[in-house]
From Swiss-Prot:
Entry's induction text: Induced by hydroxyurea.
Designated name of the protein: Replication restart protein PriA
Subunit structure: Binds ssDNA as a monomer. Binds to replication forks, subsequently PriB then DnaT bind in a 'hand-off' mechanism, which allows DnaC to load helicase DnaB onto the fork. Forms a branched DNA-PriA-PriB complex when the lagging strand is single-stranded (ss)DNA. Component of the replication restart primosome, which is composed of PriA, PriB, PriC, DnaB and DnaT; DnaG primase associates transiently with this complex. There may be 2 PriA subunits per (pre)primosome. Interacts with single-stranded binding protein (SSB). Interacts with PriB; binding is improved in the presence of ssDNA.
Region (WH) location: 115-174
Organism placement in taxonomy: Bacteria, Pseudomonadati, Pseudomonadota, Gammaproteobacteria, Enterobacterales
Organism expressing this protein natively: Escherichia coli (strain K12)
Gene (name only): priA
Length: 732
């Protein structure tokens, strides 16, 4: 009897075997309903079908129901998901279900759902409306129904309610019916509807190069300075793709930040543009997903998880702001959407465009190795003038709310000229260091030349590279000052302390806390554009693609947090943030200014960025990473473990380290650091520790991990901790 090997959404790296009853057939990629646990049925996805099982056949339960006649995934997405589960060492069931809309996970049909509507019956058309005058809601409802059908999901917006319609139904005056939406083929009347901008020479060259390779895999880095017209290149490439009857996937870092982008695509093309993001309800998400799969959607714009959308005939993938860290999932299945998008493009044999003003070092490394091709856009639209740059030395300055006196003076000047000011504060990813405010001394580990991380709760300094520790000094060993401060300031604290400095000036704080509610970001941005807010306080969210014509002063307040972080990636993140931020000032014919506050104005990173630009920084950083044998020249895997008592996690990781180093696959090129506390050592009441594995060969490191995972359950403490694997981590 055939055996179905079924993936279930459980945290176990295996499939489960079920018998297929006589007469029941199923294909890999189809959903089934199966018994699981005590008196419980679950939805599963068939990974394969065979005639054998590791268990005796008489011990296997049978599949209850097959939900699909054809796989819910296209062939290319199926291959992508199976490969990704293996590469990221994540349970196959969790991976497959992550890629499905919630309603499909729950067993809903993978087809356009019938759309229900109310209509007036023959009796309802003939009855005297005055007979309902004692029930005004019913009278209103029937009068409306006589004008035509009313869709069920529209009732909530009307003057009457569902109860009135149900009452009319009991009287035989109205009823419910349904119809399945017909497929509409946009290809029959496709045309470019919006206004085309004339491409400059660089843009035209880029579009032509990509078009010439349209029928095979090619990866293109579109490196364009802020305001150089990358979106116009995307639009022109999509014109060519849609003209061939193919579809396009456009991925963006934060869907809430790009209402302008969506509008530009919808205005440009006389074809359906669907949007996939976390703000959609379940029905909207399923509808967009199905339209992409059946070819009804010409363009899908979405965030990270949109990568797994099935397409009938995909012709190109665009990754906008490809350097953005939000493409990396940080919880659960820790995949990187940019990297998987390249795999998908290769599998589908189509071009992929990676666009950025500040490309990731991994992407630039692939360009150096001839895996990707480089296209440059160097001219800003309208020949806008670059912002004037200032570095303010904070040493010995009496700061207010984290602002130097010179910055406060500049802010007043710009505000008096009826302009707007942005203050950037970006703690995320920058580990706190200990700094002397008077002389600029930074607490540094003597064993490995990295900066100590300040642990406030334990009141000690700890090196996250070699694990050496020391108490927090009472005074600066360089100048004797007792003014030792942790680097960093919070946006909320800044907002509160700015108010008395600028009385009567409207202040708007834009960060994760203030924009979590649906529509909150759009509302705040509209207020900014109306001039309702004069001072904007924000994190890196504000650096992503917004155009603020009245912003003429931009200041970065916590530069030192990036310069002296324990995370080797923080310099790259800061360089990207600074370059993006500098493009926010003075974009509408007004001269812009950018101010950086630091205790170390002579720092080489600042000097390179200010006077040579991001490209020079990236070249220098890649050379340094190569010399230090850090990614992208080597591969990293982090194993994190956590517990409630701060005992089992480090013990488990030490046992795991011993297991790895004793493996016959481990060679002299494998480097293992730890166990050390995670950069955020305590979260949610749990203590977090980690070990880092590094190897110059990605393939070899994968083999080592595979061999280790097969034996991990032999470690005594493995069941006393929660542990996760992070392949190609982007945070220390």
């Amino acid at each position: 009897m055939p055996v179905a090997h079924v993936a279930l959404p459980v945290p176990l790296p295996r499939t489960f075997d079920y018998l297929l009853p006589e007469g029941m057939t199923v294909k890999a990629g189809c959903r089934v309903r199966v018994p699981f646990g005590k008196q419980q049925e679950r939805i599963g996805i068939v990974v394969s079908v065979s005639d054998a099982s590791e268990l005796p056949l008489n011990e296997l339960k049978a599949v209850v129901e097959v939900l699909d006649s054809e796989p819910v995934f296209t062939h290319s997405v199926w291959r992508l998901l199976l490969w990704a589960a293996d590469y990221y060492h994540h349970p196959i069931g969790d991976v497959l279900f992550h890629a499905l809309p919630i309603l499909l996970r729950q067993g809903r049909p993978a087809a356009n759902a019938p759309m229900w509507y109310w209509f007036a019956t023959e009796q309802g058309q003939a009855v005297d409306l005055n007979s309902l005058k004692r029930s005004p809601k019913q009278q209103q409802a029937l009068a409306a129904l006589r004008q035509g059908k009313i869709w069920r999901d529209q009732v909530a917006t009307l003057e009457f309610n569902d109860a009135a319609l149900q009452a009319l139904r009991k009287k035989g005056l109205c009823d419910l019916a349904s119809e399945t939406p017909e497929f509409s083929d946009w290809r029959t009347n496709y045309a470019v509807s919006g206004e085309r901008l004339r491409l400059n020479t660089e843009q035209a060259t880029a579009v032509g190069a990509i078009h010439s390779a349209a029928d095979t895999f090619s990866a293109w880095l579109l490196a364009g300075v802020t305001g150089s017209g990358k979106t116009e290149v995307y639009l022109s490439v999509l014109e060519n793709v849609l003209a061939q009857g193919k579809q396009a996937l456009v991925m963006v870092p934060e869907i809430g930040l790009t209402p302008q982008t969506i509008a530009r695509f919808r205005e440009r093309f006389n074809a359906p543009v669907e949007v996939l993001h976390s703000g959609l309800n379940d029905s909207e998400r399923l509808s967009a997903w199905l339209k992409a799969k059946n070819g009804e959607a010409a363009i899908v714009i979405g965030t990270r998880s949109a990568l797994f959308t099935p397409f009938k005939n995909l012709g190109v993938i665009v990754i906008d702001e490809e350097h953005d860290s939000s493409y990396k999932q940080q919880e659960g299945w820790r995949y990187h959407a940019r990297d998987l998008a390249v795999y998908r493009a290769h599998s589908e044999q189509i071009p992929i465009i990676l666009g950025s003003a500040t490309p990731a070092l991994e992407t630039l490394c692939n360009v150096q190795q001839k895996k990707y091709r480089l296209l440059r856009l160097t001219r800003r639209a309208g020949n806008a003038r670059p912002a004037i740059q200032h570095v303010l030395d904070l040493k010995g300055q009496k700061v207010q709310a984290g602002l130097a006196p010179a910055l406060i003076t500049r802010m007043r000047q710009h505000l008096q000229a009826d302009n707007q000011v942005i203050l950037f504060l970006n703690r995320r990813g920058f580990a706190p260091a200990l700094l002397c405010h008077d002389c600029g001394w930074i607490a540094e580990c003597p064993r490995c030349d990295h900066y100590y991380t300040l642990h406030q709760a334990q009141h000690h300094l700890r090196c996250h590279h070699c694990d050496s520790q020391r108490p927090v000094p009472r005074q600066c060993p360089s100048c004797g000052s007792t003014h030792l401060v942790p680097v960093g300031l919070g946006t909320e604290q800044l907002e509160q302390t700015l108010a008395p400095l600028f009385p009567g000036v409207p202040i708007s704080r834009i960060d994760r806390d203030t924009t979590s509610r649906k529509g909150a970001l759009e509302q705040q941005l509209a207020e900014v554009h109306r001039g309702g807010a004069r001072i904007l306080i924000g994190t890196q969210m504000l650096a992503k693609g917004h155009h603020f014509p009245d912003v003429t002063l931009v200041a970065l307040l916590d530069v030192d947090g990036a310069l002296f972080s324990a995370d080797f990636r923080s310099a790259e993140r800061f360089a990207q943030l600074y370059t993006q931020v500098a493009g926010r000032a003075g974009r509408a014919g007004k001269q812009g200014e950018v101010v950086l506050q630091t205790h170390h104005p002579e720092h080489p990173l600042l000097q390179t960025l200010l006077y040579k630009g991001y490209d020079a920084f990236a070249e220098q950083a890649l050379a340094e990473r190569r010399m230090m044998q850090l990614p992208p020249w080597t591969s990293h895997v982090i194993v994190r473990a956590e517990d409630h008592n701060n005992q089992h996690a480090p013990l488990f990781l030490q046992q795991l380290r011993n297991l790895i180093l004793s493996s016959p696959l481990a060679d002299e090129k494998l480097w293992v650091l730890g166990p050390v506390p995670a950069l955020a050592p305590k979260r949610g009441g749990r203590w977090r520790w980690q070990i880092l594995l590094q190897h110059p060969s990605r393939v070899r490191l994968q083999h080592i991990i595979n061999g280790t995972l097969a034996l991990i359950n032999t470690i005594p403490d493995s069941r006393k901790v929660k542990w996760v694997l992070d392949v190609d981590p982007i945070e220390g």
